[in-house]
Amino acid sequence: MSYNSSNSGSGRYDDNRSGNSSYSSTSRGGSSYGNRSGSDRDYNRDGGSYNRDSSRDYNSSSGSGSGNGSSSYNKYPSSSSSSSSSSSTSSYGPSKGKDFQDSWGSSSTGTTNGYNGSSNGYNSSSNGYNSSNSSSSYGASNNGYNNSSGSSSSGSSGSSNGGSYNNSGSSNSNGYSKPTSNYSYSNGYTGPTTNYSSYSNGYSTPPTSTSTSSSSTTTTTTTTPSTSYNGGSTSYGYSTSGSSNGYGGYSQPPIPSYDPSSVSSYGAVTPASSSYNASVPGSSYGNSTYRSSGYGNQSYATTNSYGSSSYGSSGFYGNAKANTGSFGSALSPISWDLSKLPRFEKNFYLEHPDVSKFTQEEIEKFRASFQMTVKGREVPPPIMQFTQAPFPGYLMKEIIGAGFPNPTPIQSQAWPIALKGRDIIGLAKTGSGKTLAFLLPSIVHINAQPVLREDDGPIVLVLAPTRELALQIQEETNKFGGTSQISNTCVYGGASKHTQVAALKKGVEIVIATPGRLIDILESGKTNLRRVTYLVLDEADRMLDMGFEPQIRKIISQIRPDRQTLMFSATWPKEVQALAHDFLTDHIQVHIGSTEITANHNVRQIVEVCQDFEKKERMLSFLGSVGRDEKVIVFAETRKGVDDLQRVLQFSGFKSIGIHGNKSQPERDFVLSQFKNGMVPIMIATDVASRGLDIKDIKYVVNYDFPNTIEVYIHRIGRTARAGASGVSYSLLTTDNARLANELIKVLTEAKQKIPIELSNLSVTPSTSSNTKKFSPYPTYSKRY
């Protein structure tokens, strides 16, 4: 039975495949989007791809296999014998693939106990593929090594799943003979440049009693193992049969997404006990050359050391442990000793002479004009013009080139606070310029810190609730941080973790991350947050709404407590207040707009009350009244609702596209690209797109399904009328939304919007008496319902 995959199609999403029960599939896609049959969309995800370019994913280094990326799949291998061609070439995993670069082991001519390359493949796991001829590959899995869902190895007694080969009788107690030349890895699993041992794929064989018959071309060995290859272990990398420090050296379950660098084992880049920057022991990090000679050609922190005496002295490096508990439980809070931490500079503010001349009356008048309120001690005056901002010349050039007339209200007050090194809480509506409010001061902060070394963590960490918002922040970072040669990376779920980890390993000054993926990487020990001195929590209220509070607290426990922290939020609920109380020090609060929940006054709000079955007709009627090229976001409550509405709109002649959490990251990127570029004017979305999408020319927002809270309603309609533009929101309410009617009326009243009589009727609280008929806002048509 062969596993063959070919792809002769082209186009961005060539997923026209058939079948999912066979091990053979063919893609002949054109440029159609998302047309699939079967369930093989799940076979084409990050890591362990089943159905990518098979010429590189499977057996691309095969010797005498069927070629062109095909190899046979031996489901029922012999448990007692194996044969190997004298010219066999076996590879462990793909030679080239999305997450793999090198073959695991080199071939060995004439060997007798080859793990792969035998006539009877060893493994029958769902992700393992072995050739019945001399060319074979052990296969890839989602974790970059043998998935432990298959059957046990050939010749093993009592082994379970996976592919770790350790035994008490091998030449090396680690279960693997030490490589004779450099060991390199990618995603933890690419291998030595020469064999690990004398065996065909570098594996020490278990003790055997052997009878051998040879010919000029083959050697057949009958093996009776005295111990099992796996020794009963159930996951890759375990050593339970006499090995004290096997490949991974685990005496406890390893971290999922196994990587040797996360523990003290062969091939580890930095053992868990190594000190921070131990590659240059005792070196004075404080005397390093600062980028651009620091801020204003000054130097800072010329004392203390980042070498062996400071960071790392507690023995932690990323605090990676076995993931034996709930998500994030492997991260232990660090007990920080501030007296041993190297100093860092965070006050760079040089007040412009024009700002110094402002009278208190002028300052109060400026703040009042934007409904700005500030709380805290020693609040610096706002910056009213870009020329008054104390940014370096290269940043000013970028700002002027962007064509901004003046700072937004939040920027005018946040910049001097942030540049003074103070903690800040910024409360402002969406589309108010919060990203640049924290980004530009962060660039100044970075340029005054010691330069990064390899394997250092970031200096600036920005946490965002969604990958869309994280990517938008990265886009702004690339625009304004490029001239200063500041590097950044974006860490979020749904994309290749290997690529993200590789960027972190090189060293980046700014990391923009969603909490879940960052926790995952921290637990695996691939990076650390010991260099972070500038922390940003963007859309903090949204992160708490999404349940990220435990992850946020875990992440902050890994950051030195004397950092500078900036928190931005559109609302100020008690949960956000509690978070600010716990993690901000001597902060200044800046609130733009009313302290009540209010909507953008530039949005014309249209509200209609109807029955549920009327909603589609009313939506289509409204969309028919707007220009065909105008950008519209339609919000639905569920993923199924998004897909259903897309079909309805397409059938009705409206060009539309949908986005929700079930779509892969490439699909979501494609949808956003089509919508941003105007190729598709209507985007249907769940609330995954209701926050952080910075698309400035959205004219209309349609609430097909009214949200569960007024806060979400305000965030949704905030997608339009950004950066001073005007927009329109159109919302459909049913009797199911009656509990929100009073709050909605308050929002409409504050924004001086028209209140329909049906909404007023809906806001009347019906009697709870059992004799009271069901309330309806439609007295004229009540008999019809």
UniProtKB/Swiss-Prot annotation:
Listed Low complexity bias regions: 1-11, 18-37, 49-95, 105-177, 192-233
Residue interval(s) of motif Q motif: 384-412
Residue ranges annotated for the Helicase ATP-binding domain, each copy included: 415-590
Domain Helicase C-terminal: start-end pairs: 602-763
Biased composition (Polar residues): 178-191, 764-774
Record keywords, A-Z: ATP-binding, Cytoplasm, Helicase, Hydrolase, Nonsense-mediated mRNA decay, Nucleotide-binding, Nucleus, Ribosome biogenesis, RNA-binding, rRNA processing
Official protein name in the record: Probable ATP-dependent RNA helicase ddx17
Source organism of the structure: Dictyostelium discoideum
Lineage, opening ranks: Eukaryota, Amoebozoa, Evosea, Eumycetozoa, Dictyostelia
Gene: ddx17
